[in-house]
């Protein structure tokens, strides 16, 4: 919990739903007001009968700060923790992923798992806090234009609303839900294709490229490459491996000292230490 309206609303609704709730606060050490945030979250947890736990992580300033802070946060939080992402957060994520050139998974946005507020708007959580006379903390970093998400939130989405002459957030979220259904279907086919990469590459080569690409990404992660969300399997590397699967190359480098080869109708991944 950050002490903002979304996380406070999540706390209240989780308690009202009869769940045994523990409010977790993570201090990233990035701004001086973090102690006040922890106090507010602790007080809110006590008011609504929830337990409270505080965590501290170290996140050095520098590039990719948002992603590194998010990873550090999830590393200390328990598995299955609920988050206060709303419909607005989903729309922002879809647009951010679109600008990064993400594929189907990225355009499907965040998974619904552990996000019980995904059908609510940010205005709903603000209204709930006002009704309960809760005063959320305002994170000044959410207004900092150096962070791309903030520009999407404060500049791009209002511009799209104006151009479309309607609220685009529900439209973006509806499209992401449709794309998630497509992505899940492809994932099922990729699971079946995965075994062929190590046992019979020729069979994998006959499958549609969309399925083989997914199988390649899963295969890489299963073998220790690209597990870190900050460094997922690179799209160009996947295309090079696809060429190996199709016998257009006998091997390829995929970065960071890793290499993929095809031998005896099997795909092999070689780590920098092998």
Model-derived regions: residue spans:
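Amphipathic, well-packed alpha-helical segments that form the structural scaffold of globular domains
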Residues: 130, 134, 157, 161, ...
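AMP-forming adenylation/ATP pyrophosphatase catalytic core
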Residues: 1-6, 25-28, 57-59, 72, ...
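Alpha-solenoid HEAT/Armadillo repeat architecture
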Residues: 118, 161-162, 205, 221
């Amino acid at each position: 919990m950050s002490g903002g309206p979304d996380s406070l609303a999540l706390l209240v609704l989780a308690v009202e739903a009869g769940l045994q709730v523990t409010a977790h606060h993570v201090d990233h050490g990035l701004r001086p007001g973090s102690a006040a945030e922890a106090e507010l979250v602790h007080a809110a947890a006590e008011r609504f009968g929830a337990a409270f736990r505080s965590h501290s992580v170290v996140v050095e300033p520098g590039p990719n700060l948002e992603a590194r802070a998010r990873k550090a946060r999830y590393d200390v939080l328990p598995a299955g923790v609920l988050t206060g992402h709303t419909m607005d957060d989903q729309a922002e994520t879809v647009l951010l992923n679109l600008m990064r050139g993400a594929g189907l998974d990225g355009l499907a946005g965040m998974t619904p798992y552990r996000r019980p507020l995904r059908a609510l708007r940010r205005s709903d959580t603000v209204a709930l806090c006002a009704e309960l006379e809760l005063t959320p903390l305002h994170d000044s970093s959410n207004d900092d234009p150096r962070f791309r998400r903030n520009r999407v939130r404060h500049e791009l989405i209002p511009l799209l609303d104006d151009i479309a002459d309607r609220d685009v957030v529900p439209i973006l979220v509806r499209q992401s839900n449709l794309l998630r259904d497509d992505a899940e279907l492809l994932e099922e086919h990729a699971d079946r294709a995965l075994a062929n990469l190590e046992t019979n590459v020729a069979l994998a080569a006959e499958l549609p490229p969309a399925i083989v690409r997914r199988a390649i990404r899963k295969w890489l992660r299963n073998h220790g490459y690209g597990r870190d969300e900050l460094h997922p399997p690179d799209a160009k590397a996947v295309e090079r491996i696809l060429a190996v699967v199709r016998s257009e190359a006998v091997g390829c480098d995929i970065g960071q000292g890793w290499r993929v080869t095809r031998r005896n109708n099997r795909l092999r991944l070689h780590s920098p230490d092998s």
